[in-house]
Amino acid sequence: MTATPAVIGLSAGNRLLSASFGPTDLMPDKVSLGVGGGGGGGGGGGGGDAMSFAPPAPATPKLTAVAAHRLKLSPHGRAQVMRALRHHSSAAAALAPPPPPPPPPTPSPASRAAHAHDLESSLEAIVLLQRSMLEKQWELPFDDDNHAMAIGLAEDDDDTSKATVVVARSSVSARQRRMSGRRRGRTKNGAAHFAVSPELIQSRNRIYLRGTVSKELLTHKQVVHLSHKIKDGIWLQQQRSKLKEKLGNEPSYKQLAHSLKISPPELRSRMHESFLAREMLTMSNLRLVISIAQKYDNLGVELADLIQGGLIGLLRGIEKFDASRGFRISTYVYWWIRQGVSRALAENSKTFRLPTYLHERLIAIRGAKYELEDQGIAPTIENIAGSLNISEKKVLNATEAVNKVLSLDQQAFPSLNGLPGETLHSYIEDQNVANDPWHGFEEWYLKEEVNKLLNSTLNERERDIIRLYHGIGKQCHTWEDISRQFGLSRERVRQVGLIAMEKLKHAARRKNLEALLEDY
């Protein structure tokens, strides 16, 4: 507990300092931390003009210090009096018990208004601080129209401590502001970043939204601008390929930028703008791809595959488009889209893939056939060849290449009872003789007859020589190999073999098996 001195009047303070105190007057039971009314307990003088110490709590004992005489003291004596007074005041404060906490004051209407004003000021300061921090972070001018914040304080009559803060949402997302701030930032060397053109990004956002095709068409001026961006990107890719051949590996952005004598940020910006320009032109002509692909629908290919082929042709046409010739891009890419759709139709419509030129020739032959039928002329090969101004051999080869493909697992006839019937595989002859069971039986029967003939006609040595030489059940051997196995000369083994063959011929004729030994 500390005592807070309060000086009430300058004259009273002077009188207190000019008074003298006796030892008995400064006892704790006579020191008061307040102002005594009138003279009070120690004698007259003083009255209400005296130096007082305001008591912090009513429970503190009242200790009074009263001047007995009015004497004139020197400055040194006054200092001693003040030190004695402070010493006894601190002792009295130490003996007093701690006071209870003061009750909360009842707010007045003036204090309520001041509190609301302070709260409003603090909220405004917080909002302004956040605003300045965001401006510093994004380094963008803070537009009051797009980034206005409205702060409203709703005061309730019953509860004045609640305040509602209403922040209006900006039309530009935080992510876009961060990206713009990064693009507008500066490099470590102090050079400015080369940011992507904001007009290009805004146009891209208007063209499509999450893959949805937009009905907004590009003007000729926009197409020319985007075409120049694409040409620039193609040129950069060509320079990158040349540098790759020169270095022997994939060059980095720094290496490519150094070879082109530009900065890496500028290189990245130009390549990104080329990518965005190609994407914008592709999305703006997507409806043309769909309309062309729908004309080739129901020809054996899914519409999605046709659209994919048309998109490949569209990308090729966008890269080849030259805006300086004055043609519209839709007129130019139409033929590229049509070529891509036709190629997709040729590659996916048949089970066995036909070359693209042959597929185009078949389309021309089909068209000539319909024209001849409309004119009442028989669509023969000669008439079709004359109509297309090609040879009859080319027409014949193209028509023979088109064969209907059927699966052997397909049912040969429709089932009447709902059960699976016989398939086409059951009605097709197998040309492989090894798969014929009768052929296997005949081969096994002939082997048995030959073995019986050998066992019944020849002795053991003759049978072994014949089996080794002709490879019956084993590998064929020469007369020299057989002679080494039997320890005989080559000529002797050959004579034994010839004699054995003559015996077999006579025995085969008797059993009507001479056809087996006809070659011998």
From Swiss-Prot:
Residues 1-66 form a transit peptide. Disruption phenotype: Pale-green leaf phenotype due to reduced chlorophyll content. Residues 96-108 have a biased composition (Pro residues). Keywords: Chloroplast, DNA-binding, Plastid, Sigma factor, Transcription, Transcription regulation, Transit peptide. GO terms for cellular component: chloroplast. Residues 175-187 have a biased composition (Basic residues). Belongs to the sigma-70 factor family. This is RNA polymerase sigma factor sigA. It comes from Oryza sativa subsp. japonica (Rice).
